[in-house]
């Protein structure tokens, strides 16, 4: 199994290291446009092998030729939003980056599974799908896995229980448009509504929506990377080991939930072939309305990018 991570920043490097540490790849490529960064980080990771007991071949590179014949490619490359930059500016710049990255990936790998982490997530996943020409089941956005992990973490803090006993369902877009579905959120099988008052649940939902911003506020510079990197690796593990995990991911819908031709976060089965099944679960009307609203925002932004992405 050969896995490539595009972007050697905090998210990309964390993702690459966890893939190596969990022995999910025989060969791992960390690629970045900045000379020396992927080479240095790649070598540092490789030198942990004797301690971590893994033999993954790790290559740091600036050349897409080194990514040839990758089975999985993870795109973390992109710019953060800077002061004075409008959302439209960020969209255009990152769409250009993801377009170029995807074009280069496809020159060297015929049929990879592409996992997109770059923001705005759902829209960048659409860009990667359009440019790659791959079937929708092979282009996946990492969104709900991270959002659900944050929701679970906050519930565990509130109740003082193990995170392992908490299951959470978060659908929709990554960010303000996410839809944490309370009725499918449980603690050891017990509905969260039986354990916490509605106003406390509402506060946890709101904290989940602002989870990324909360970390940015603490850090002052930069954003989250341990939790996004770990969330990507949960997806990679299900694909590589063909575990058939049911995880919330941004995928291209074709009529499910009344949404068509739009990438949005819903529960899917992830296996060796990528998205092997999309689950259309029963939603309350309020949650369905929020999900469709989230999809509409994604669709509008994608239409704005049509001339950019070709």
UniProtKB/Swiss-Prot annotation:
Binding annotation for NAD(+): 7-12, 32, 94, 117-119
EC code(s) of this entry: 1.1.1.37
Pfam families named in the record: Ldh_1_C, Ldh_1_N
One of the GO biological process terms: lactate metabolic process
CDD domains (alphabetical): LDH-like_MDH
Gene3D superfamilies assigned: Lactate dehydrogenase/glycoside hydrolase, family 4, C-terminal, NAD(P)-binding Rossmann-like Domain
Active site, renumbered: 174
Gene Ontology molecular function, alphabetical: L-lactate dehydrogenase activity; L-malate dehydrogenase (NAD+) activity
Reactions catalysed: (S)-malate + NAD(+) = oxaloacetate + NADH + H(+)
Keyword tags: NAD, Oxidoreductase, Tricarboxylic acid cycle
Binding site for substrate: 81, 87, 119, 150
NCBIfam families cross-referenced by the UniProt entry: MalateDH_bact, PRK06223.1
Assigned protein family: Belongs to the LDH/MDH superfamily. MDH type 3 family.
Protein task: Catalyzes the reversible oxidation of malate to oxaloacetate.
UniProt subunit comment: Homotetramer; arranged as a dimer of dimers.
Protein name in the entry: Malate dehydrogenase
Biological source species: Prosthecochloris vibrioformis
Protein encoded by which gene: mdh
